Amino acid sequence: MSTWVEIERAARQLSAHERKLLLTRISEELEADSRVHEPPAGYGGALAERRLFTLEEYLEIERRSPLRHEYVAGEIFAMGQPRQAHELVAVTLAAALRSHLGGHPCRTYAGGRMLHFKCRGDDIAYYPDVWVGCGESRNAQGEFDDEPRLVIEVLSPSTARIDRREKALNYREIPSLQEFVLVDPKPVRLVIHRRAEQWSPIVLEAPDALLELRSVGLTLSAGQIYEGVP
């Protein structure tokens, strides 16, 4: 396998067709890296040391790769596989929101939908565990969606630090976002950040706590959210 320095040098001499082939190769190398290496603390396979990618290159990689990656100001990070408790909580929240918003122009997405936005001039692309968007798709592929209103991240051991710090700060830069919620699958812990309250965290830890999602007019009990979680 060629070094990344060699690949980057060669890219300057390539035609459009050759560049597309190169992006395929980059995608394959990203996939190989994320399969072989253990996820570092905070992210499932940080690839920042390789090189900086344009947003267009990243999107092309995502279209070709069976693995998902997040994009932060030119850096690409492979995403790890969620654990059972994480998946159960995310599915429960998404199902409740989808049922509640039936017939409403806002849409609920769970895990597989990219959320792209600008943060202090940089492009960011995340895959929130659950989010509600109330705008229109930006392109034919549907990668982007305008006006996210609610974002929910379910914490995992490998992503908790990133979710609490980096993402909590970056999501605030989305003008349409009204609420950002962090959910710890074990033990019961819900943290709500609302724009209307200057993003000050509200922490709920009681087993009978009620999560009030004001941005979409839905209230869920902790019992509902954590149902079936071992």
Indicate residue ranges for each PLM-predicted region:
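Gly/Pro/Ser/Thr-rich low-complexity, intrinsically disordered segments predominantly at protein N-termini
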Residues: 2-10, 17-230
